[in-house]
Amino acid sequence: MENISLYVCSYNVEKTIEEVIIGILNLDPKPNEIIIVNDGSTKKNNLVFKKMSHLKKIEVLNLRKNVKAQIAIATGLNFLKKEKFQGGIIVMDADGQDDPEYLIDIFKESKKNPERTITINRTKRDDELPFKILYQMYLFLSFLLTFKYLKFGVYSYLHSSSLDKILSTNDIHLAYAASLAKHFKNKNVIFAPRKKRILGESQNNYKSLTHYALKIISVFRNQVLINSIVLVFISFLLSKLITSSALFLFILLALLFFNVIIFLLAYQINKSHVVNDTLKNIENIENLRNELL
């Protein structure tokens, strides 16, 4: 099997990440190395793992401050680029919702074409009905404005040869999954249900999820602007047919406001000092494998 680096993003989830990593170490085949990005956790990690003889290394990148998942992912990928890593890279979250058992499917799929990006598309979500309704509305709106149907999250595979491309813009700091969809048109897909969190409840609320949805769409802001102009033109023609300008004015103002929001989000990210050099936010690197030798 080609050299595979597994990259796990974590924040205050020592218990869950321990279960996730143990599950990974019990797989056959296994990744060659594991990199855990500790996104400024306030709780101290005391991770110790067995069955590590096959691993080249298992490292923890401790970030100075919490920068949230998307920038933490970018930090890890920049680190792999700096280290001149060659091979496949698997990105997953540490909350247990990304099922480690599907790593076997990723390994098999990556053998067919190691340089082809792979996404893990979710087939089932255990969410409350209001959230499911809002999620479907978001999928419809995002498809209408971007022509992208995004049913995958951070759980994915990409090759080291793709690092320059995905890190060429700041889009990855807005939304990693959307950046994959934007930069890599041809992707292989693996379908998998989204598991429940191992411990605790998600700290995301409707406000934070709405903010994240806007950041996802802002990755495609230029396409959204073009599609918005087309929609405004169509609404103008419709308003002439029904002899009413209310529909036209509503769509015009709504899309104008929406475009201002997503362009402002992108502007804020581009001007943020945090994303200018994410590697400076790495406080230290722990080698867990060395601690066991």
Explain the meaning of each model-derived region.
Residues 1-23:
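N-proximal low-complexity "stem/linker" segments adjacent to membrane-targeting elements
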Residues 22-31:
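Short, acidic, metal-binding catalytic loop of nucleotide-sugar glycosyltransferases
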Residues 64-65, 70-79, 91, 97-174, ...:
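Acceptor/aglycone-binding surface of glycosyltransferases and processive sugar-polymer synthases
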Residues 38-47, 96-97:
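A conserved acidic beta->alpha catalytic loop
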Residues 31-41, 61-62:
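Short beta-strand/loop segment that forms part of the nucleotide-sugar
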Residues 225-293:
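Terminal low-complexity segments of carbohydrate-biosynthetic enzymes
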Residues 12, 39-41, 67:
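Conserved short acidic donor-positioning loop in nucleotide-sugar-dependent glycosyltransferases
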Residues 164-223:
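Catalytic donor/gating beta->alpha subdomain of glycosyltransferases that bind UDP-sugars
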